[in-house]
């Protein structure tokens, strides 16, 4: 990164104009290869012979070959042939896109470094706490119980390819890089591997996730520019490629600027954007905009967002992708949890002098529940049970050792308990534990050609210990005869700051 900074440093006024030559630097592909190890398998791992073949001459030839292709003469048989150095059409495009994805992130990385360096002598909180999915739920728990209505929003799709290029023009001012980006987009659009519009959200190529996640986050960042007028109560999860602190700095900077503009030119509509009880949360393609206002106010917000996205992105955005729901009468699926705000009635006895009377109070409480039916559907899809929730064996794992089979089932169970530790009612999780434990026993019994009853008698205690969660292990070791109050602490909601992605079984959509 220091070498890249020196490369871009000579002229600060044009520091974004030198990205294209970086494509021909060999160390860029080494850096992209190292970053690929942390996310997904790199093309260099799948093709070990290419790690010594990245050079300026080869990259120039690859780009030339890409631009000189006659797409009208390519048949289905030609797409499987080796075009250059033993790689096919999609593979050598991927070789350059890996390096290109790393290069276009440089302006964002340098901006983040400069933002962090501006906090001289100040202690900055750890940014990974902001990255945690569970960090959003305490925010919802503290604020949503006081609100009335919520807008459930799906990010508009599909977007025109040229809009993606124009979005990056504000950050990457290198015409050559933008031309190459435009070529990549049209190339993958023709291969039907960039964006799939058959379902809500986006489906990315598995081999170029870093590149496509960067484009998607840039697009979402532009979509969220309409929310810059929200106050600092807003909570936003980090995008995949952007730093959380960088997003907040840009967010509040735009907020102050837009408020000044509306104060000067749009006095009449300013009240709509200065709602002090407006909160916004987003993860993946879903967004939540909640307010203490009336239904009429939320309806104005709905049509404002529809008109803004239609005009700004030149797409047909249907109003059906934004739903107005009352918090007290609606449950929403968000990040694998089924969350709602319900009225919790309580009876209080009051006494004034010699007279006593009862008072009924209804307190709003934010609930987070485990969606049992979709979760059982995910287990059934993974062949752990039937669609009705009856445990079955996993024949694919029958060739593994007994310890590996028990460890795999136990790890899945512990991960689910860890992810759903914030559930208000954890009785559902014990049904999931029962399914996984009995599925494990059936798999082992199938392997040893015996019955489940016989196997459980032989190794029941060992199997039980493997399925204990971390909280249960601590309580059972520290307090062998734990009181009901201690187990009540375990049954309470616990939010962890080390969860950065949705559990694979919880992400059932």
Swiss-Prot record:
Pfam families linked: Intron_maturas2, MatK_N
Main location: plastid
GO annotation, cellular component aspect: chloroplast
Signal keyword on record: no
A biological-process GO annotation: mRNA processing
Gene Ontology MF annotations: RNA binding
Disulfide bonds: none
Entries under PANTHER family matching the protein: MATURASE K
Official protein name in the record: Maturase K
Record gene name: matK
